[in-house]
Amino acid sequence: MINGFTIFGYKIYFYGIILMLGVLAAAWLATREAKRRGWNPEVVWDMLPWALVGGIIGARLWHIFTPPASMVEQGITTMYYLTHPLQILNVRNGGLGIPGAVMGGALAVYIFARKNKQSFGAWTDIVAPGLALGQAIGRWGNFFNQEVYGAPSNLPWSIFIDAAHRLPEYSAVERYHPLFLYECVWNLLNMTLLLFLGRMKPGLKTGSLFAVYMIFYGTGRFFLEFLRLDISPVAGININQLFMAIVVGLGVLLLVWLNVIRPRLQKPQETPASAE
């Protein structure tokens, strides 16, 4: 499969182009949401460089410390990166990890919000639907790279994987679950749910939409990891799956805290009337 083109001797990959389209789509939807909520949409574009830098750093670090099994078999391990530090900067060697991108981007947005006296919770709610949209689009980069595919499958929508991109133990198997497509659809459902809640449930406390994003996205990724062949094992545990379980748990706790526990703690206590 063709995965890019060459300009002046430099290879341009479709993966990078699609990622940028996802970023722009996410920013576009965030500006729409900001305007609808009465916030300044220009802040989105001021925030974007921060989120991009934080997201790329986080995504790269996630890959470095949780390389997939196929790369470990090739000797591309965490220790390899630590002993070849220049390779850490070579994002074409290895790749990026979405969990790290979300964490790094969120941390960068938090720093931006504190620095510019913005509400971090409000802005996470604003960008959450766009984040889901950007992830849905970005997953199509995996299609051109022929990666993030699932277990062997004969279903009508299964995809053909070139021999060069198959895991050694599946070298004779041609068709697989399109895991990237499943996650794309799941992210679009997440975006739809967040847009619906943002319009139909105005009583939700600030930060609640991002909590819903965490729960919905984390749940989908957790179960999709069961289909994934090229996992990232740490001490025999699929670290991506463990992380997503933690994300779901934190999302539930955050949602309950914001909408149930904190309002009760802030509710003024009624004092009994004094007898006369």
Short names for language-model regions:
Residues 1-276:
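Hydrophobic, membrane-interfacing alpha helices
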